[in-house]
């Protein structure tokens, strides 16, 4: 067993060896190294064919038409292209956007930028479960609403939003619907033929593909128009210029094909391991699961250990690679904005750890993780005066702390 144990699959996944092997065939002189846009010789044709195959594989993962797949540098770029692209193209129709407070920063910061440009954004507050009721979205809709952007699976707490119902509502009101599917593509069955989604962001490195590659699904029926953010050679139907990174695209395609083929088996294994981890630690006193228990992605477990400081817990869990929120915001010592939006106080938000399990996690690793967590929580609480006061029956909320 290799230490530290990797339990941060929501931050990134290792590239599947089968994917890496496919990518290696697109790099060197004796491989498919040509520019897919070179139409005058075999090297270009081979690369174009490899890209076409990968585009089909990504399309099949979500049951889309391959012409609806636009390759980008990742889900962050896809989110930017979708939200800014719609806002700028349809600005004459309206300037109101609806999203939620628990979205990824790639969506929230893009919306903040649009606010600086004169757009109006409504940020919905989810229920304590992390779920956003369709009625809440409907109540926020206005005559000038042009876009709703809601993620399918939350990156910190793993809750699954009902994008089918939200899609139906948006379609009935003729409002464009964007879904950030970075955490769900390749892990949940997605069918854009039945789910009324207009735009969907997908990430390669969240499903055992390489980093630096993603895709944006752009619906053709109804046809969604976007204003491009990257101008140049008119690649990707003019939506995203730039020479296509054949090796990364091929990697993402292969990762999508494997994810589709192995999804059921993978998910069953991962769900079993996640339940094993939770059942191993849920009897620890003052331990709470964050987010809806039922409507949750199978690899995700976000737990608050009351009276333990999150950063000190992560240092105590040095044998476990885990995080206290999303990787993109983990450098800040602020408590998770996602957990704060669920109504957790600063202390509980600070004492939370995100465990995310994936394809290469083993039973042995989960057993070791359970023992490590139990031991670390015990040690840290022994040192905590707050824990001692709590055990003595003192109501900590009513204590008047002296300010120095």
Curated annotation (Swiss-Prot):
The active site is at residue 328. [2Fe-2S] cluster binds at residue 328. It is found in: Cytoplasm. One of its GO terms (biological process) is [2Fe-2S] cluster assembly. One of its GO terms (molecular function) is 2 iron, 2 sulfur cluster binding. Keywords: 2Fe-2S, Cytoplasm, Iron, Iron-sulfur, Metal-binding, Pyridoxal phosphate, Transferase. It catalyses: (sulfur carrier)-H + L-cysteine = (sulfur carrier)-SH + L-alanine. The modification N6-(pyridoxal phosphate)lysine is found at residue 206. Its cofactor is pyridoxal 5'-phosphate. It is an enzyme of class 2 (transferase). Pyridoxal 5'-phosphate binds at residues 75-76, 155, 183, 203-205, 243. Pathway: Cofactor biosynthesis; iron-sulfur cluster biosynthesis. GO terms for cellular component: L-cysteine desulfurase complex. Its EC number is 2.8.1.7. Belongs to the class-V pyridoxal-phosphate-dependent aminotransferase family. NifS/IscS subfamily. Master enzyme that delivers sulfur to a number of partners involved in Fe-S cluster assembly, tRNA modification or cofactor biosynthesis. Catalyzes the removal of elemental sulfur atoms from cysteine to produce alanine. Functions as a sulfur delivery protein for Fe-S cluster synthesis onto IscU, an Fe-S scaffold assembly protein, as well as other S acceptor proteins. Homodimer. Forms a heterotetramer with IscU, interacts with other sulfur acceptors. This is Cysteine desulfurase IscS. It comes from Shewanella pealeana (strain ATCC 700345 / ANG-SQ1).
């Amino acid at each position: 067993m290799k230490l530290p144990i990797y339990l941060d699959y929501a931050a990134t996944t290792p590239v599947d060896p089968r994917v890496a092997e496919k990518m290696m065939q697109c790099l060197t002189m004796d491989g498919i190294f040509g520019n897919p846009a070179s139409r005058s010789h075999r090297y270009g044709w081979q690369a174009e064919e490899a890209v076409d195959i990968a585009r089909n594989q990504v399309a099949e993962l979500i049951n889309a038409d391959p012409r609806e797949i636009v390759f980008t540098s990742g889900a962050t770029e896809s989110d930017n292209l979708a939200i800014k692209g719609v806002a700028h193209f349809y600005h004459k129709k309206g300037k109101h956007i609806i999203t939620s407070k628990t979205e990824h920063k790639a969506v929230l910061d893009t919306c903040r930028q649009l606010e600086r440009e004169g757009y109006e954004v409504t940020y919905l507050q989810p229920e304590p479960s992390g779920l956003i009721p369709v009625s809440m979205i409907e109540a926020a809709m206005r005559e000038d609403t042009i876009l709703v952007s809601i993620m399918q699976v939350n990156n910190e707490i793993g809750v699954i939003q009902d994008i089918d119902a939200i899609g139906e509502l948006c379609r009935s009101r003729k409002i464009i619907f964007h879904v950030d599917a970075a955490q769900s593509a390749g892990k949940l069955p997605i069918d854009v033929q039945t789910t009324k989604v207009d735009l969907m962001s997908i990430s390669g490195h969240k499903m055992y593909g390489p980093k630096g590659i993603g895709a944006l699904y752009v619906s053709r029926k109804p046809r969604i128009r976007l204003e491009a953010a990257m101008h140049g050679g008119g690649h990707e139907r003019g939506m995203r210029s730039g020479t296509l990174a054949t090796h990364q695209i091929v990697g993402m395609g292969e990762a999508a094909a494997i994810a589709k083929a192995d999804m059921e088996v993978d998910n069953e294994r991962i769900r079993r391991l996640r339940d094993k981890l939770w059942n191993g630690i849920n009897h620890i006193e003052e331990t709470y699961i964050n987010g809806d228990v039922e409507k949750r992605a199978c690899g995700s477990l976000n737990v608050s250990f009351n009276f333990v400081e999150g950063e000190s817990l992560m240092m105590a869990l040095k044998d476990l690679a885990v995080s206290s929120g999303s990787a993109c915001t983990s450098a800040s010592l602020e408590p998770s904005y996602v957990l704060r939006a669920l109504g957790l106080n600063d202390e509980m938000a600070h004492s939370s750890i995100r465990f995310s399990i994936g394809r290469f996690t083993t039973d042995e690793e989960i057993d070791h993780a359970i023992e490590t967590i139990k031991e670390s929580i015990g040690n840290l609480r022994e040192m905590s005066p707050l824990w001692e006061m709590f055990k003595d029956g003192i109501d900590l909320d009513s204590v008047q702390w002296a300010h120095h």
